[in-house]
């Protein structure tokens, strides 16, 4: 959302696919760089992506050196890997931290001329709450200085977000609770923002109602698709 002196604009640049829609994106894909966190890789959950890539005959490489909040070291390592692999697509599977890391990796690789400028960026969130898959923000930490650096740029936006409820249902109850409250917090923040408008109000109100009606049920029964 952008607000100027004489006009307001509301837009969502990221294309959203709801459901198990990654297969529809593999046509024409040749090399995919998969960014995920260490848990997703070690638990085998990254197969949600790699199995589909194998079926489509796509060459792939996984970068999973992400644990906790993304820091400069993780992003630097990821940038080196993506430069070496030279993919046409980046696919991120994970929560807000993994998506932020992938955003920074793609952003820096492009800015330094070490990645294809036309690389497609696909984000597949495994939690609700941050909305990182459709935002122009990323936060990277410098652990040595104890400083968090915000990155803000339209080029950080993923080209496509795949929202598959099955991935969220696999989260443990504690994560469902934490990210559910995160959804509520972001919705309230949007509703009281000085940059709010009728479109954002409608989205915020709907999110607040959904959290109120369904968060406790999702916490108690993660397999309840409703």
Features from the language model and the residues they span:
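N-terminal amphipathic/basic leader segments beginning at the initiator methionine
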Residues: 1-29
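Small-residue-rich anion-binding loops in enzyme active sites
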Residues: 20-58
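Conserved beta-strand elements of the Class I
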Residues: 32-34, 89-91, 122
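Short beta-strand/turn micro-motifs composed of small residues
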Residues: 36, 94, 141
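N-terminal small/polar loop signature for handling phosphorylated ligands or for N-terminal nucleophile
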Residues: 46-117, 216-225
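A glycine/threonine-rich phosphate-anchoring loop and its flanking beta-alpha core
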Residues: 110-199
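Active-site segments that bind and position negatively charged phosphate/pyrophosphate groups
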Residues: 194-226
């Amino acid at each position: 959302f952008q607000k100027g002196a004489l006009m307001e604009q509301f837009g969502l640049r990221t294309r959203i696919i709801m459901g198990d829609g990654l297969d529809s994106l593999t046509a024409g894909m040749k090399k995919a760089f998969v960014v995920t966190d260490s848990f997703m890789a070690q638990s085998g959950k990254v197969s949600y992506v790699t199995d589909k890539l194998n079926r489509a005959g796509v060459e792939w490489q996984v970068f999973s050196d992400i644990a906790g909040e993304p820091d400069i070291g993780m992003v630097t390592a990821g940038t080196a890997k993506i430069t070496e692999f030279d993919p046409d697509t980046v696919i991120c599977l994970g929560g807000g931290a993994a998506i932020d890391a992938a955003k920074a990796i793609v952003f820096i690789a492009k800015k330094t001329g070490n990645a294809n400028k036309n690389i497609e960026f696909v984000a597949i969130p495994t939690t609700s709450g941050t909305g990182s898959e459709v935002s122009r923000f990323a936060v990277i930490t410098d652990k040595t200085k104890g400083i968090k650096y915000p990155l803000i740029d339209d080029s950080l936006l993923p080209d496509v977000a795949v929202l598959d409820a099955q991935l969220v249902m696999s989260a443990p109850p504690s994560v469902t609770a934490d990210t559910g409250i995160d959804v509520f917090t972001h919705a309230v923040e949007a509703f009281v923002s000085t940059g709010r408008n009728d479109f954002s109000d409608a989205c915020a109100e709907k999110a607040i109602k959904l959290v109120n009606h369904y968060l406790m049920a999702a916490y108690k029964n993660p397999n309840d698709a409703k």
